[in-house]
């Protein structure tokens, strides 16, 4: 039977000093021997998705202590990708994921914590904590801050829903008046919470449900709604139960690697494809799988992408639905229920509720259960009141959206498309693959061929797009923006947004070894692997080269002869695979990250071969 890790610091005469320090933190004599549970918070006033988390850690802590544990809270950093976007700050976003994972490991292992509750929300925080949970493999439950309410405003006598991307697009569109742009800006982000569409933050919080590491409702229940408080209370109670089951009953089934196993990762990517989630989730799932030694890679993602239909269409792929609408339709449990009925779910995986996914769906899928409490929970809706306070309203929809033919969530027979929301493309331009969010691609450009317009940085691409260098039919190529080449693998939301604002959103393609915001839509292909800095073919493209993209057949081809490519490669080998004339300051911290970063097909994690002798 495993020994409590915390006993290392709480038992034995030689630990008198450690116990003295524990006492100074408030631990009482009768507490020694109880499990020490880390409350891993990520409160910050920089990020709307985290601004309301300050007191929620102690909410969890009180429940832990009432259930017989010792709760100790600490915070991680949290970068707001939207605020960091469009300037040098975005270089730090993805590397912050590794720092978060490491900082959780450092705190938990340094103090010998027995288990943890992870309070996350936004883009890199949930993935960083997920990587740490898989790495440490101690009992863990995730509970996120929840989604923001969708913005709403009146334009041309019509109420429309808004989000961050609308503010960015309107601000970049020269045809939009200053007054309208300011109106959209003021209305786009009305409350605390992660941005209101199926962007990276909400996608990842949904995926923790599919992985079995969070409770039903975690991904979709609004940050402002009073019902969300129960998720935090239950997390505090439940983590003590899981901890005692492992350490006192030798039940290893409650550990993250046994909950989030290969089948659970396949369920997570099936959910991601079905809901048209952010392409960043691919990066983060690959990274988490590696931390947990789960054999899950791009081959699995490619296979699943050919099987799973697109069942849920949400902003940025449509402005009709946001996360509050997904919740009203049954949330993640509703989507997983449809995958189950389509035979596309492995429902014998376990969850932090201590039951199988099949049993959990029987209780929480609104199409399977008539439990009034569950139906009431999924009717939790927005209040439309600007606030930074969690649990500040208790509004409810009058009815559920359980229309699986024309509603927000569809059954397989009435899917938005039988082809899923994500696809892996391969070819001589991306030998190890690249990712496109097909949910956001117009049917007219699923097959596309055009001349390349090559840029060595995102900044140059933005200037080129706004300067009129890109024409209808072009393929914009932005390279040396991968994990190593950027470094930091910047998000390319501004280039895609500006293509739309210039009227080219359905007339151009964009290819990069960088990545895209969860707010991106259009023919935007990212994660080209190997990246240019690692000798990838994307580093050999020249302006004017023809590029052929075929999403239905999952291919991407640089239409240049092998002999010409060989000559170009020899030239780049001499030049060292570096961007030409790029003006960018790279700090020592970023250089340290770049020195060990793998390409996107490996999750942009550290190259462990450089650490192992």
UniProtKB/Swiss-Prot annotation:
It catalyses: (2R)-2,3-dihydroxy-3-methylbutanoate = 3-methyl-2-oxobutanoate + H2O; (2R,3R)-2,3-dihydroxy-3-methylpentanoate = (S)-3-methyl-2-oxopentanoate + H2O. The active site is at residue 517. [2Fe-2S] cluster binds at residues 122, 195. Pathway: Amino-acid biosynthesis; L-isoleucine biosynthesis; L-isoleucine from 2-oxobutanoate: step 3/4; Amino-acid biosynthesis; L-valine biosynthesis; L-valine from pyruvate: step 3/4. Its cofactor is [2Fe-2S] cluster; Mg(2+). Its EC number is 4.2.1.9. The keyword Protease does not apply. It comes from the Bacteria. Disulfide bonds: none annotated. Homodimer. Functions in the biosynthesis of branched-chain amino acids. Catalyzes the dehydration of (2R,3R)-2,3-dihydroxy-3-methylpentanoate (2,3-dihydroxy-3-methylvalerate) into 2-oxo-3-methylpentanoate (2-oxo-3-methylvalerate) and of (2R)-2,3-dihydroxy-3-methylbutanoate (2,3-dihydroxyisovalerate) into 2-oxo-3-methylbutanoate (2-oxoisovalerate), the penultimate precursor to L-isoleucine and L-valine, respectively. PANTHER family: D-XYLONATE DEHYDRATASE, D-XYLONATE DEHYDRATASE YAGF-RELATED. This is Dihydroxy-acid dehydratase. It comes from Vibrio cholerae serotype O1 (strain ATCC 39315 / El Tor Inaba N16961). The gene is ilvD.
């Amino acid at each position: 039977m495993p020994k409590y890790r915390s006993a290392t610091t709480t038992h034995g005469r030689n630990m008198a000093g450690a116990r003295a320090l524990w006492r100074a933190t408030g631990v009482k004599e009768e507490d020694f021997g109880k499990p020490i549970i880390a409350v891993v918070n990520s409160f910050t006033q920089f990020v709307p998705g985290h601004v309301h988390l300050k007191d929620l850690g102690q909410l969890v802590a009180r429940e832990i202590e009432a259930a017989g544990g010792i709760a100790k809270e600490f915070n991680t950093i949290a970068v707001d990708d939207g605020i960091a976007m469009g300037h040098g700050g975005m270089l730090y976003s993805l590397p912050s994921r590794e720092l978060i994972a490491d900082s959780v490991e450092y705190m938990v292992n340094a103090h010998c914590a027995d288990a943890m509750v992870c309070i996350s929300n936004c883009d890199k925080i949930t993935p960083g904590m997920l990587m740490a949970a898989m790495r440490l493999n101690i009992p863990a439950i995730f509970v996120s801050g929840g989604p923001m309410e969708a913005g709403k405003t009146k334009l041309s006598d019509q109420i429309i829903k808004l989000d961050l991307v609308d503010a960015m697009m309107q601000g970049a569109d020269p045809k939009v008046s200053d007054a309208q742009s300011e109106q959209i800006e003021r209305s786009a982000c009305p409350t605390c919470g992660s941005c209101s569409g199926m962007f990276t933050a909400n996608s990842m919080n949904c995926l923790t449900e599919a992985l079995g590491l969070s409770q039903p409702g975690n991904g979709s229940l609004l940050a402002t709604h009073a019902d969300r408080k129960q998720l935090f209370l239950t997390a505090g109670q439940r983590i003590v139960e899981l901890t005692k089951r492992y350490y006192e009953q030798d039940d290893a089934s409650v550990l993250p690697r046994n909950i989030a196993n290969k089948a659970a990762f396949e369920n997570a990517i099936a959910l991601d494809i079905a809901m048209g989630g952010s392409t960043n989730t691919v990066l983060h799932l690959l990274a988490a799988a590696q931390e947990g030694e789960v054999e899950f890679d791009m081959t699995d993602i490619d296979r699943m992408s050919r099987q799973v239909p697109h069942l849920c269409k949400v902003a940025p792929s449509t402005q009709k639905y946001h996360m509050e609408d997904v919740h009203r339709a049954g949330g993640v449990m509703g989507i997983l229920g449809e995958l189950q009925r389509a035979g596309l779910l492995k429902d014998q995986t376990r969850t932090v509720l201590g039951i199988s996914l099949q049993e959990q769906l029987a209780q929480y899928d609104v199409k399977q259960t008539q439990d009034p409490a569950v139906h009431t929970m999924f009717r939790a809706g927005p209040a439309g009141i600007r606030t930074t306070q969690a649990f500040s309203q208790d509004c409810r929809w009058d009815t559920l959206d359980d229309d699986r033919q024309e509603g927000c969530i569809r059954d397989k027979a009435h899917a938005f498309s039988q082809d899923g929301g994500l696809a892996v493309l391969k070819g001589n331009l991306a030998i190890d693959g690249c990712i496109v969010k097909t949910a956001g691609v117009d049917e007219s450009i699923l097959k596309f061929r055009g001349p390349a317009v090559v840029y060595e940085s995102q900044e140059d691409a933005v200037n080129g797009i706004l300067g009129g260098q890109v024409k209808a039919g072009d393929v914009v190529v932005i390279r040396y923006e991968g994990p190593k080449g950027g470094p930091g693998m910047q998000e390319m939301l501004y280039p895609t947004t500006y293509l739309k604002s210039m009227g080219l959103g359905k007339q151009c393609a964009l290819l990069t070894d960088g990545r895209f915001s969860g707010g991106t839509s259009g023919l935007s292909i990212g994660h080209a692997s190997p990246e240019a800095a690692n000798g990838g073919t994307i580093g050999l493209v020249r302006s004017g080269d023809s590029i052929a993209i075929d999403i239905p057949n999952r291919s991407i081809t640089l239409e240049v002869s092998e002999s010409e490519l060989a000559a170009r490669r020899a030239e780049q080998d001499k030049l060292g695979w570096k961007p030409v004339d790029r003006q960018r300051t790279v700090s020592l911290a970023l250089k340290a990250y770049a020195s060990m970063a793998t390409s996107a097909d490996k999750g942009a994690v550290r190259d462990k071969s450089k650490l192992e002798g």
